[in-house]
Amino acid sequence: MDYDSMKEQWGEVEDRDGVRLSWNVFPSTRMEASRLVVPIGALYTPLKEKPDTPLLQFEPVTCKQPCRSVLNPFCQVDVRARLWICPFCLSRNPLPPHYKDITAQAIPPELHPSNTTIEYRLSRPAPSPPIFLYVVDTCQEEDSLAALKESLIMSLSLLPENALVGLITYGTMAQVHEIGYTECAKSYVFRGSKEYAAKQVQEMLGLIQPAMRPGMPAHQPGRPMPMGPASRFLLPVTQAEFQLTKALEQLQQDPWPISSDRRNLRCTGVALSVAVGLLETSFQNAGGRIMLFAGGPATEGPGMVVGPELREPIRSHHDIDRDNVKYYKKALKFYDNLAKRTAHNGHTIDIFAGCLDQVGLLEMKGLCNSTGGHMILTDSFTSSMFKQSFIRVFEKDGDDNLLMGFNAVLEVLTTKELKVTGLIGHAVSLNKKSTSVGETECGIGNTCSWKMCGIDPKASYGVYFEIAQGGPSQHQQNQKGMIQFLTYYQHSSGQFHLRVTTIARDLSGPAGDPAIAHSFDQEAAAVLMSRIAVFKAEVDDGPDVLRWVDRMLIRLCSRFADYRKDDPSSFRLEKNFTLYPQFMFHLRRSQFLQVFNNSPDETAFYRHVLDHEDVSNSLVMIQPTLDSYTFDQEGGQPVLLDSSSIQPTHILLLDTFFHILIFHGETVAEWRKAGYQDQEGYENFASLLEQPKEDARDLITDRFPLPRFIVCDHGGSQARFLLSKLNPSTTHTSGAGAYGGVGAQSAQTIFTDDVSLQTFMEHLMKLAVSGTN
């Protein structure tokens, strides 16, 4: 099968099951696996939207303890004996009594060969409706606060009618608004400079449950939670809308006086720990989101990231490298502990930053990364980037249910040939051991089950595997390795759901089977490797991570390219490997690994989004797409991400996922400034200017978070966004264009010391064929 038809097949599997694998044939021995260089990995999107996924209204048929795999199309079923054999633990299980009428022709939907992904609506109800707790920073400019209040009031109409909603505001103090009290505005105030233990918060808010007192009957699972003391602060939207709208409308800027040489006093840490404490008492393991709207950095109390004096700048990457950071470690520890508590309770924290300065996302990143929350970085709450991204959080399906899931858990089962080594994505380990757990660790390892808390249809997880020590005893024809993904989550309709995806792939034949190399999916592999690189970058030095990326690439090319030893000119890669080196070239230069020119908050934000997206979106982040528009062609044409693509009469459209940029070549910019597009007879020029704008609008429609939209001209300051992404094939040192040589007129000269893709490939070939890694 040629590469294009294989790619098509992988695309169909991704549409059906939400899975892309780095290798689509599994090696049958550990020795063979160790020579693959790129680990066996799956990028899995559990809630991938697919209208035809069957939703079954009954409990799944599961294997006996401790296996608990779910009946699927790969199970052998003995219709006469009413038995099914589990492919994971090989035990025989009786079919339930209501399956007595099945025949080889009439089979239940979960055994149908096309239903490798299926969803069950479980009978277990959610302990309470979904909870939304808004935590709002009042130390903001008047216009920014007004825009935020407007967005929050509007969002109440997007919530399910039974959703519980609450409000905490903070500045110098943190205030919990008692919206259940209707006589007047009433709130509980916490000092911003003091650290409160969970128990103190609960006592001060009067939340200690009566059920905790001796002699009281304990709460029975499965029954709705009694609306105890917490109902003063969290009420169903339908009841609370009037009070909450009034409280939001009356929100004023923080009244604490501030001199011109000081920052506002902001107790973000106290506000968050009060929010976590409020949900922890009454709503443990009930789906809920704490949504933080930060207009600046925390400057007092636990979790402060910078001092209140303006002459003290907020930490940069350089400060962190030199360990010149006063608050960083303490703040990081504080927020990481808060994240652990939140994840343990099954709740999610979203952070919306609306500020030109940094707000401390670097320190707070664990809050989102451990709980499956969103992280949105914008310049202000007045920007459409914030407003539209915020609305998209509440997207709904055809039945008017929120697309987001709550309180989610992912479990992975494997057949005996495979073992799970870990997961990289927004989740925490549940420390569950099973026969599927491997010896080595990649990402969050030593477990086969993870808690994600918040999950949405785009959320994707990198799951990594190894081949078991013994491997298959002896190779039999058509032997397959299998993986089953079980995702339990609270659906916004109020029931728990279980999404089951089961995949099977061939095991390779005797050593040196070419099927393994043919099964390499370079796009999935690039994304899975970039997740490992970013995971490493969080703990290792930048240069060490780049060296690791290079080393792995050289080893992969040495292993799978065709060449004669020590002859770089003989180097050839198969079609399904050719793009991989350039993905790695762009990954090395990307903002995920090169932190120069980005603030620590931006780096945390970019890495957060990369760890959330699927293969195609992640590839756009790693290697942006570039389209060119000119007079003698219809629409945009994809062009190389290269400085030679900049031409005076062309318009370029760059999509980096985070930015969408329209760049006008020198001549086009001059014509536009002269106003030709408004003159008669120049309609084709006017439509040329419009085309990239229309395409940009299409790109923005379903993108989350909303990208920044930039229109710039050749030589303009904003053009740096484009130049930094291009392969510098024409630099001030490359001759072409340096001294008016050939090509000086057309291509843009880029002033950089970065190597070009061509030089990078030459070095790669030389090292790969020399056999020294």
Swiss-Prot record:
A single GO BP: intracellular protein transport
Cysteines joined through disulfide linkages: none
Signal sequence interval, chain numbering: none
InterPro entries assigned to the protein according to its UniProt record, in alphabetical order: ADF-H/Gelsolin-like_dom_sf, Gelsolin-like_dom, Gelsolin-like_dom_sf, Sec23, Sec23/24_helical_dom, Sec23/24_helical_dom_sf, Sec23/24_trunk_dom, Sec23_24_beta_S
GO CC annotation: COPII vesicle coat; endoplasmic reticulum exit site; endoplasmic reticulum membrane; Golgi membrane
CDD domains: Sec23-like, Sec23_C
Subcellular locations according to the entry: Cytoplasm; Cytoplasmic vesicle, COPII-coated vesicle membrane; Endoplasmic reticulum membrane; Golgi apparatus membrane
Topology in membrane: Peripheral membrane protein
Keywords, comma-separated and alphabetical: Cytoplasm, Cytoplasmic vesicle, Endoplasmic reticulum, ER-Golgi transport, Golgi apparatus, Membrane, Metal-binding, Protein transport, Transport, Zinc
Single Gene Ontology MF annotation: zinc ion binding
Transmembrane segments: none
Binding-site residues for Zn(2+), renumbered to this chain: 63, 67, 86, 89
Domain of life: Eukaryota
Subunit structure: The COPII coat is composed of at least 5 proteins: the SEC23/24 complex, the SEC13/31 complex, and the protein SAR1.
Role of this protein: Component of the coat protein complex II (COPII) which promotes the formation of transport vesicles from the endoplasmic reticulum (ER). The coat has two main functions, the physical deformation of the endoplasmic reticulum membrane into vesicles and the selection of cargo molecules.
PANTHER family according to UniProt: PROTEIN TRANSPORT PROTEIN SEC23
Similarity comment: family membership: Belongs to the SEC23/SEC24 family. SEC23 subfamily.
Listed name of the protein: Protein transport protein SEC23
Gene behind this protein: SEC23
